[in-house]
């Protein structure tokens, strides 16, 4: 079963449908685009006309999903953080295949002791294995964006340390990495 986030006018949707998924769900917030998708793909997809930030993805299907998305760049880190923080031991997906703004992807895959390493690196690699697939130039899109993009694949880790409240990790990393240039003791004052 497949879930696509933000299908827009359905370009990626059409390609995914060629693979004949058992079930295909899409989450599209825009009412006009949802109507367009409904007309274009009829009963081939299940449209969830809602905001991805307000949905419990684990309630969409009893099966584990393969998730595709060219995430809206302005909320991509918020979406990813939400998914990671809300993950239980039983993951609701097999893999996430997601497009990010290249700068964001570089922060997600950054190794420790590098300038890009921070909150997103820690959160993403806590429960997930992350692999960079390809950088994509603006010329590959229509309309052409002003920035480069990167495709990443996330798969569940078999072993990760459990936290009583995962939001604490998000909060602590946000505090520490928002003040990179200041002394480490400052956040504790």
Question: Where do the PLM segments sit?
Answer:
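C-terminal lobe and adjacent flexible extensions of AdoMet/dcAdoMet transferase-like proteins
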Residues: 156, 173-189
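Catalytic cores of RNA-modifying enzymes
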Residues: 1-167, 171, 175
């Amino acid at each position: 079963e497949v879930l696509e986030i933000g299908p827009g006018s359905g370009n990626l949707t059409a390609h995914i449908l060629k693979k004949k998924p058992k079930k295909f769900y899409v989450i599209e917030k825009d009412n006009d685009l949802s109507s367009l998708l409904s007309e274009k793909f009829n009963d081939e997809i299940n449209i969830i006309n809602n905001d991805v930030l307000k949905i419990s993805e684990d309630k969409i299907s009893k099966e584990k999903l393969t998730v595709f998305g060219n995430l809206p760049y302005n909320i991509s880190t918020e979406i990813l953080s939400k998914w990671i923080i809300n993950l239980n031991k039983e993951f609701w997906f097999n893999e996430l295949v997601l497009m990010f703004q290249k700068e964001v992807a570089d922060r997600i895959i950054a190794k420790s002791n590098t300038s890009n390493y921070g909150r997103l690196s820690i959160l993403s690699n806590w429960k997930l294995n992350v692999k960079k697939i390809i950088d994509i130039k603006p010329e590959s899109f229509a309309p052409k964006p002003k920035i480069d993009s990167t495709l990443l694949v996330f798969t569940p880790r078999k072993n990760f340390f459990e936290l009583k409240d995962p939001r604490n990790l998000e909060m602590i990393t946000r505090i520490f990495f928002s003040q990179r240039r200041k002394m480490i003791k400052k956040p504790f004052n």
